Every structure is written in C-alpha cells, then in structure tokens.
Regions:
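Flexible cytoplasmic inter-helical loops of multi-pass small-molecule transporters
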Residues: 148-172
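Intracellular juxtamembrane helix-capping segments at the cytosolic ends
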Residues: 76-90
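Extracytoplasmic gate region of multi-pass secondary transporters
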Residues: 175-233
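Glycine-rich segments within core transmembrane alpha-helices of 12-TM secondary carriers
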Residues: 91-114
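Symmetry-related core transmembrane helices of the 12-TM Major Facilitator Superfamily/SLC fold
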Residues: 127-146
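Conserved MFS/SLC helix-loop-helix module at the cytosolic interface between two early adjacent transmembrane helices
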Residues: 22-60
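Central cavity-lining transmembrane alpha-helices of secondary-active solute carriers
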Residues: 11-29, 223-235
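Hydrophobic core of transmembrane alpha-helices in multi-pass small-molecule transporters
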Residues: 61-77, 191-192
Length: 235
C-alpha cells in the first residue's frame, strides 16, 4: 500500500520502537502513583486506539504513529503493568506467579499467528485491524469484572509466616540500578532473544518469500517458539 521496501519498514519499526522505549521510562513509573486497575484501563484503551489506527494507515507518518502506539501500549505497557501487578500482589511465590502470568503471552504467541493468517484468507487486513480494536474494548469490561473487581493487592499472601515477619525486598532506585554492574550483565542475556525475535517478526514476509515458504510456515514456527517458551518458564 505504501510502496516501501523491507529495509525501510524495518527502519520505521526500529525508530518507533526506540521512541516508545524512551517514553516507557517516563510513563511506566506512573503506575507507582495511581491505581493499577485504572492504569491498566488506560493502557488497554490505548491499545485499542493503536489497533484502529492500523486500519487507517495511508502514509508513512500514520504507519510510524500506529507502530509507536502499538509498541508502547502492547508489548511495553501491557507487559509492564502485568509484571508490576504480580510483583506487588505476591511476595513468597513471586517467581512462580510471574512465570504463570507469562503463560498468557505464550498462549497468544501459540494461537494468534495461525489464527491471523487464517482470517486474512477471507478478511481484508484493514477490516481485521478494526475487528481487533473492537474486540479489545469489548473484552475489557469482562476482564475487569472477573479478575480485578474489588481486588486488594495486600490480600493474596500473608506477611507473616510462623509468627515471623517476612523481610521486605529492598526497593531499588533507578540510579542505584544503573550503577550496579550486575544490571548490565543481566541486560545482555535478556536483550539477546528480543533482538533475534523482533528481527524474525519484522522480516517474516521477506524471509517467507526468499525461502519460497507457504503463508503458514512462519505462523507454525511461532507456535513452536511459544511451546518452548512455556517449557523454559518453569525451568
């Protein structure tokens, strides 16, 4: 539609992602200043808006804005809100809870690629983005009612065990984290997979055409990726 090359799209995607990561540093900390449910509500609404914008792409500017909002609200703030909520909600079983919560993302990585490829065989891509936008908004009140209604963050686990007060985990400041060399060691291991996966996601069309693969090959690869992700979550 926009007559851009794979390389140009990759540059637009990378620029939008980089900008969203900088904005995430500022917006992400707002979750500490407001109700988590309200914060998550705004994030989901923004995700719906970004999905709708994809259906209206008519220029490179619109494409950049849509990718920026999608990366910020989707993989950025949605993951951030989920991890932050779980970390506050659990203390003794925090690691297990975080692993379980990520099953949602892995399940989506398993189901959605094949589903989207199938739907694109008889639904125009712009209509599909509109449908996704509507589905996100319609799902929101259901999720609120069944999962977070009247939930208090201090009700899941007791703060005492055998009449002993569990020591609180130290709350690090951002400057303390940046000064700790271990942070950069962890970053190298955590950033490797996202870089590799993002490259595969962005250039999946080019990879498929150059290898002469069918439309379902990449989608099936995502399914295998999600299965292995689930396995490693509990290792």
């Amino acid at each position: 539609t926009l007559s851009i090359s794979h390389g140009q799209f990759g540059s637009i995607y990378a620029s939008a992602t980089l900008l969203s990561s900088f904005i995430l540093i500022w917006i992400g900390k707002k979750i500490d200043d407001m109700n988590i449910s309200k914060f998550a509500f705004y994030v989901v609404v923004l995700l719906s808006i970004s999905s709708f914008l994809f259906s209206k792409i008519s220029s490179i500017v619109y494409l950049f804005i849509a990718i920026f909002l999608m990366r910020l609200s989707g993989q950025g703030l949605m993951s951030h809100a989920a991890s932050t909520t779980i970390s506050r909600y659990f203390e003794k079983s925090r690691g297990k809870a975080l692993s379980t919560s990520w099953l949602g993302l892995s399940s989506a990585e398993f189901v959605m690629p094949l589903t989207i490829v199938f739907l694109l065989t008889f639904i125009e891509w712009r209509d599909l983005w509109i449908s996704i936008s509507i589905l996100v908004i319609l799902t929101l009140p259901i999720v609120i009612f069944f999962t977070v209604k009247d939930v208090k963050l201090d009700t899941r686990e007791e703060t005492t065990f055998n009449n002993k007060i569990i020591e609180k985990i130290k709350q690090w400041k951002r400057i303390e984290v940046l000064k700790d060399y271990r942070f950069y060691i962890v970053c190298m291991t955590m950033l490797a997979m996202p870089w590799i996966a993002t490259g595969s996601f962005v250039y999946q069309s080019f990879i498929s055409s150059s290898k002469e693969w069918g439309p379902y090959v990449i989608a099936q690869s995502f399914m295998a990726y999600s299965i292995l992700s689930v396995i490693t979550l509990f290792i």
